[in-house]
Amino acid sequence: MHLTADQVAALKASWPEVSAGDGGAQLGLEMFTKYFHENPQMMFIFGYSGRTEALKHSSKLQHHGKVIIDQIGKAVAEMDNAKQMAGTLHALGVRHKGFGDIRAEFFPALGMCLLDAMEEKVPGLNRTLWAAAYREISDACIAGLQS
């Protein structure tokens, strides 16, 4: 599924609210905290340990979350050029091959946690639209990961 021009415009219009404040660092941290709470076995794969509550104070995890939110912001900025966006995200997926046992099946659950965190931050967020955007973003990353 490719997003329409109107959908891309809506995503771009809502991005400033999604990333407001600290540029998405807290949003990324909330995403990962939810993900690890629901999938504690994934902490080791992502290089973290300890209690999920303690991770809320991890500068390393906050940085990792911000990097992901920054990348989503770049993808949103490039969405009106699907080929460019796909190329950028494909390269990101290729880079993730070197980070250990990162697999395509990790992306859907992480996406659900991202959407939950986004909805908490921005009440009234168009979750259906953002879910479609996340699928496009993650599909391009996965293509690189599996190449």
UniProtKB/Swiss-Prot annotation:
Protein source organism: Glycera dibranchiata (Bloodworm)
SUPFAM superfamilies per UniProt: Globin-like
Family classification: Belongs to the globin family.
Other facts: This protein is one of at least six components in the polymeric fraction of Glycera hemoglobin.
Assembly behavior: Polymer.
Binding, heme b: 96
Record keywords, A-Z: Heme, Iron, Metal-binding, Oxygen transport, Transport
Top-level taxon in the UniProt lineage: Eukaryota
MF annotations from Gene Ontology: heme binding; metal ion binding; oxygen binding; oxygen carrier activity
Classification via Pfam families: Globin
Domain Globin: 2-146
Name by which UniProt lists this protein: Globin, major polymeric component P1
